């Protein structure tokens, strides 16, 4: 959802705009959310962005939610005037209240510790997790979902996106062998960059319109990339499994295979990096329009492109089979295609990722 309140880039046209104030009112940052006028403003701001799509259009489709920067009512930005993350107390209130009202927490899982950050909170049932979840399909497949904003730190070389206990859980599950397939699904995509501040990578958009690390990215933390490399190493080290990471965020449909991650040579066991596609993006919301560059492999990664990033509405279907993961990619062009075509769309690309061994 989009209702940025303080971010220099987005707030003027989103949550701090005159139109937003007319539609929903203004938040009081020193007040609670529930039981105050803040709750009214929240419902007016969030409800129309969530309910018609996920409560109506997807009413017969199970949907699981990961929060990212805008779900905390800010864009990830860092300047000398403001650094929007880690989330402030009020940002946390809004994000938690939105989840409480509109979409579910993750159910308990026997393999996920109940004491991870933002799990078993005092105002939630024991074992419910707000930011780190598991989708489990018997012994066939497990998908690990994790929010990189809730616990991020600004500690230089030791900074993290994901609390170290959460990282320990992710790596333990990746090393375990009790499911045929295991997929990582973080809220910020490994393998791809648009030069934003709150990404895994240090790349920025250079004057030539390309990503570069020759210019510093202010307030970016080296520890974020170190954690990324630890997670990618754990995926690459899996035996008899397809190393696959799926994310959204960058408003594109894409697939590539990581052949190098920093100093880690992955040519013998590439990691498939998928951008699953956006189901809805406003005309000015595509990265190439907003930032001057679309989803692009960062300099830290050598990526063999199989599906070059496409900035259109779409989605990805993954079929988990005992011996493979089969991916089908779908796209729909708002500018040239009628909505009736969505019901009969065929994949524009499909790929089979066989298990190792």
Question: Which residues does each predicted region cover?
Answer:
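Metal-dependent phosphoester/phosphodiester hydrolase catalytic core
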Residues: 1-357
